[in-house]
Amino acid sequence: MLPPSGFAGLVPPSHFQARPLPTLPRMAPTWASDVPLVQSPASQDVLERRLDAQRSTVTTWGQDFCGDGQGLGRRGRSLELGFSSALSQQAELISRQLQELRRLEEEVRSLRETSLQQKMRLETQAVELDALAVAEKAGQAEAEGLRTALAGAEMVRKNLEEAKHKELEEIQSLHQEQLSSLTQAHQKALDSLASKAEGLEKSLNSLETKRAGEAKQLAMAQKEADMLRNQLSKTQEELEAQVTLVESLRKYVGEQVLPEFPSQEWELERKELLDTLKHLKEDRADLQATVELLQVRVQSLTHMLALQEEELTRKIQPLDPLEPEFPKKCRSLLRNWREKVFALMVQLKAQDLQHRDSTSQLRIQVAELQEQVTSQSQEQAILQRALQDKTAQVEVERMSTKSLQMELDQAQEARRRQEQQIASAEEQLKFVVGAMNSTQAKLQSTMTRMDQAVARIPSLSNRLSYAVRKVHTIKGLMARKVALAQLRVESSPPSEAAPPLDTDLSVELEQLREERNRLDAELQLSAHLIQQEVGRAREQGEVERRRLIEVAQQLEQELQRAQESLASVGQQLEAARRGQQESTEEAASLRQELTQQQEIYGQALQEKVAEVETRLREQLSDTKRRLNEARREQAKAVVSLRQIQHKATQEKERNQELRRLQDEARKEEGQRLTRRVQELERDKNLMLQRLLAVLPSGVNKKCSPRSVESSSSESPAAASCKESVKGSLTVLLDNLQGLSEAISRDEDICVEDNQNTKKTKNPPSDPLLS
């Protein structure tokens, strides 16, 4: 029987009830950044020492329990308390490790987010560096474009100067040729007026010279057309280049200049030149036809005159020796009349030809002067447009210099921003590298701790299994002790004061059994749960370890990439700095060149403007002088035309007077001849009457046959003489009538020709006369 004093230090059953384990909050700890993530090795050593001490106490408790039976309840309770405290500590350790694993997961997520942000920043920096490189390339391209534009402007200026010099030389040569041709034409006209007898030959020579001049003019026109075509092609190319340049630079100038179409003007000029060539060819063909007709008429007239002279010389013979002056007078009168008529006809034809030549020359001169005026006005307009283009180019260059200055300022500001961004990026990269190194060190430390915890899990499981076995042995010993106590109680004699004690003991024993069963069930359940939690924690730890290894590898790769990108960014930064220095140097040199070019170009432009103004003034004065000369020549031509018309009217009046005089002379000569014949017949009759009266009648009788014979002989002689005189007179009259008819026909033809020429010349001659 157990002594009652042995149960005096028993613990109530409520003390052995299951206590809930302390649960830590799942929220993120506030001491994550201040307290170290994992417990220090000193705390781990303390925990291990506590576990060893508990293990030693458990073993000593078992030994004492085996050796001593009185302190069984106390030792069992202390053992259970120690075991429950060890389990609670292990559960706390496991929960702390789980919390640390969760905190590590959160840190890994935050590191991933920071790495993604750093990647984005690096990508933005790379994009900005690419944009800077593109901007630098664009600046270099613009600088090269400005250089090429300056070179092109210089080439255009040189080409324009050469073309203007060539045009001036060509215009001077053309003016000299025109002046020489005009002087030659005037000299020829004066020579033709001075020498009327050689008018036809000189007109033919003048026509030949005109033909040669027209051929020369045609050749010159063809050359000019070729030159104009070449110039057209060159100017079209230059204009296309200028149009492209103007269109590309309109946004700087702000002016919307309508594109010019000089090709249409050149086409119109070419068409006008072709029309003038056609008209000249037609005029030349007409002149050739008129010359041929005139030659035919002259030949026919000379032939007719030769025939008439032969007939007159053959028919008119001196029959009357008493009157030898009559045929001479007739011949002289006829010759003078022929010469005068021929001279008048030649003069009229020469005047008509001169009038035609002068009018055609005046028309040609007026057309040439008009063409010169139009060409000079076109040149003036072209030069004004060129000046406007040059001023626009100067303004564009000024705007481009301003834009380049602004771009340089922007590039410098961008460079400063890039330097600041690069410095901030370097600092961020340094911070990221430090954070990565710290996270890598923390990950390595956590991995080592996880490995240590995983390595300690088998030893802890062995300890748990050993503790379970010890509990079973203790339970068996306890049951044996209880059974021995019951046997002792049963074998001991009952006493009077013992029943209440037995009832208390039995109640306490029942409670102890229940408590034992409950604790046994709890121990088994807790051991099973601990094993499950340990397995789950082991699996989670393995998975987390693998994931952390992968994350660490990824972070290492990202770190390497970041370092490589940092190196490339540094290289690009160095290249960008070098390119920026080169661009700044090139910009400075370009500024100097641009200022020099602007000064040179401004001086050259001012000189060119002054030269163009002086040349235009000279050309305007020359054109005014030529216009005045042309007007004076036109007035002279009008005066000469009026004089020629007056002379023609006077010549017509003279011709009419001569015809009237010739008719009167012819009538008087016929009357005189008839009177002479009548007087001769009367004298003859008187002589015959006197002879008949003087001679005696005998003699008359004797001599009657003789007289009859003589009269018969004289009568045929007189008759023959009369017949010859009458025949000569009739022939002369017939010749005179034929000549007068021929002259009248020629005059009618000349009058018709004059009327036709006047009709054809009156419409264009009105502006000249006005």
Swiss-Prot record:
GO biological process: cell differentiation; protein export from nucleus
Compositionally biased residues, Basic and acidic residues: 648-672
Keywords: Coiled coil, Cytoplasm, Developmental protein, Differentiation, Nucleus
Statement: the UniProt record of this protein carries the keyword Cytoplasm: yes
Ranges of biased composition (kind: Low complexity): 701-721
GO cellular component term of the entry, any: cytoplasm
UniProt keyword annotation of Zinc-finger present: no
Pfam families linked to this entry: HCR
Function: May be a regulator of keratinocyte proliferation or differentiation.
Protein name: Coiled-coil alpha-helical rod protein 1
Originating species: Mus musculus (Mouse)
Lineage, opening ranks: Eukaryota, Metazoa, Chordata, Craniata, Vertebrata
This protein's encoding gene: Cchcr1
